[in-house]
């Protein structure tokens, strides 16, 4: 299961709900957070993870394809990775691993895996980060992925239920 959402609207209620969802995921014994700026400051997403236990965070350098491969491996090992990509534009580099492997695991094996992928659509306010940071590829990934649900989180009240559903999915 993937949860891919809109994140950077600078609305404190939106942030608060993201943080509440990440704290909830962090309390589950089988979750591990993977990605850039999960342990160390570097993106707007970092602050939503500040109360997640340190032993549940795996900091990675900029290596999106490798990160997706690690996510696949963690899921195959029976854990629940929450793989974090700061922007959709960066997630593009992980497409091979997600489309060709994570999406197909249940079709090519007896494994029942869980994985949550979190990404964001860059905000153009209060400061425009330039075009390589504001892509929204939600619809494109919905076309490419047949076994992974894509959930776009536009409103704060959507956030916690979506992550709870992703975690509890069988």
Residues covered by each model-derived region:
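Thiamine diphosphate
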Residues: 1-170
